[in-house]
Amino acid sequence: MLFEPTTLRSLSLRNRVVMSPMTRSRAVEANTPNALMAEYYAQRAGAGLIITEGTSPSPNGLGYARIPGLYNASQAAGWKLVTDAVHAKGGKIVIQLMHTGRVSHAANLPAGAEVVGPTAAVLPGEMYTDSKGMQPHSAPRAMTQADIDHVVAEYAASAQLAIEAGFDGVELHGANGYLIEQFLNGNVNQRTDGYGGSAAGRNRFALEVVRAVAKRIGAGKVGIRVSPHGVFNATGPFDGVDEQYVALVKELSAIGLLYLHQLDHSAMGAPAVPAGIKAALRDAFKGPYILAGGFDRASGEKALQSGQADLVAYGRPFISNPDLVERLKKDVALTAPDFSTFYTPGAKGYTDYAVQTA
């Protein structure tokens, strides 16, 4: 099933292999996509669906060095280079919109931008900046109602730009401890207003973003990525997490989204997401379901055959194997990635991995 054509709502896909979103930090000029990024994604257009790296809908969401944005015309033009290149190879591509929230340092933000989050609690640990090296995370300003309304509007405007730039859809990043999950997670969200204090309160921001984006570009063009039980960026399980996410996903299902994307980081050393919640979310979402997390050919095929997923997402193997689909199909050995070039500017470790299956 892995290599069979399929449909994702109105999209026709050449196979059920998805390229997972992965930060690569190559948007070196004003957080704007470029020809090098277009080449990178076009090399990987053999995937049934590409999900881009996390892309900020706001200057305030550019927490990491050199990640791309999509909130102005020049960034939209840069992304048009990418979508044109992928479509020229017969691929399909959606953009992942990711506001980093408190996972940020002010040195990584453009002039006039600020670090914001659900509360003023600082994320423990450090992050890399080009100008100052490793630095403790910056203190966020707690978002007001006006801030929340503004960010929701930024997501909708960015989604509109995405469609104008030629994307086949948009994925909202609701995992890995970034802004949407900062509201969802009971360990992080300590608000006492209508955006916290209960499961419904914690779900509210995510649903407002989803509904605003769906209203702007159509629900059938909007996917979302979630990871209950994820531990990235000081999240982690909390009391009632399973019940909260089932309630969230039932509401998302009723909106009629493009897909639900469930992430499990256990292959990278994090605790596994319990099988029960994966199955519960699969049951709660009446639409296409993508699973990600450490799959190879055999386990990906098993997930499809057993009905656990409709599509299977692969991450790091795509970094060093641009022809991953053909390698999996022909059982060709995979090239190991160079971890030292994951986030460095330039072509090395980005567009210079060889194709072995031509």
Give the residues covered by each predicted segment.
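Flavin-dependent oxidoreductase catalytic cores
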Residues: 1-358
